[in-house]
Amino acid sequence: MQNENPWIEICPGIKRQTKTSGKTMYQMLATLEAGSKMPAHQHPQEQIVHILSGRMKLIVDGTAHEMKTGDSYYLAGNVPHGVETIEETRVLDTFSPPRDEYLAIDAANRQRT
């Protein structure tokens, strides 16, 4: 099945594409260019970060965790976290509950095309 969801830039050098979602879960693919950074942020959803390829630093509540291909990390809701990308990286992120704001952005972008 072809994914019709658009690629959306989250911040410079970091894009995401919704892969699937349900009543209690949401999953997206993210591509991160080498040297890109996502500032510290937090959200109420739990998150599992899984590195498909590449290397990055996941900074959780001020502590850096270097992650490489095959690594996963669980983030509780409302925990401050950010990213510093060491090399081009692909990440599969899973959230619970869904990221409704991302789904709304996807829907708005599909209507424009």
Regions found by a protein language model. Give the residues of each.
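Structural motif
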Residues: I48, R55-K57, A64, P80, ...
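A short, N-terminal "cap"/entry segment at the start of jelly-roll beta-barrel domains
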Residues: M1-T24, A104-T113
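Conserved short histidine dyad/triad with adjacent acidic residue
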Residues: C11, M28-Q42
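Anionic, Ser/Thr-rich low-complexity intrinsically disordered regions
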Residues: A30, L58-V60, L92, D100-A108, ...
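A cytosolic small-molecule/anion-sensing beta-strand core signal
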Residues: L52-S53, K68-T69, E87
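Short, conserved beta-strand element in jelly-roll/cupin
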Residues: T31-E33, H43-L58
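Ligand-binding loop in jelly-roll beta-barrel domains
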Residues: G77-E101
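Short acidic-glycine-tyrosine-enriched beta hairpin
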Residues: G62-N78
